[in-house]
Amino acid sequence: MSIKIIDYNGVDPYAKTAGVTKTEVAEAYFQKTVMKCTGTTTQETALYSDALMSYASPQMGESVSIYKADCYSKDNPIYVVKGINANGNEFEEIVDARKINPKNCSFNELMVLNVETGHTSPKDYLRAAALRANADADSYFEKADYILHAQEVMGDYKVLGNWDSYLAMDKWLQSLLDYVMKSGFRK
């Protein structure tokens, strides 16, 4: 029995296009399906195109957008994280990227580190999402040890012989850890 990827309309996403690589289809599919998946539950979620990064989980009813604060500078990496929480309430919080401990942070804080280190591609988001799934976090606000979960996911990649993903995850993780060390945060 074979397993196929089926989109929300019951169509194999690879069957919808011709003359493109699977990578191009996968990235286009990601942008069309994940980044625009608003309003699929009774609770409304919102993604904003003016944000540095915006993501949502209709299943949890949460949506988050990340912006640089007005006082942002390289020496003062302050971000505004705002959106809608699982209770349907709007929230806004100020996050200093220098004070984020990836061994005990929320997914939102991990994404601020992603933005601060220039990791804003769909692949970077999916790396972080894989860690969140490994952490079994029920909310973007739930804290977890994302370093531990990165090591676990990398261990899985190693066992499976998925060296491209292993090396990409390692490079991404090292970039985050280098930033954390340079910012002076120690734990």
Describe the predicted segments one by one.
Residues 1-187:
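Type III/flagellar secretion export determinants
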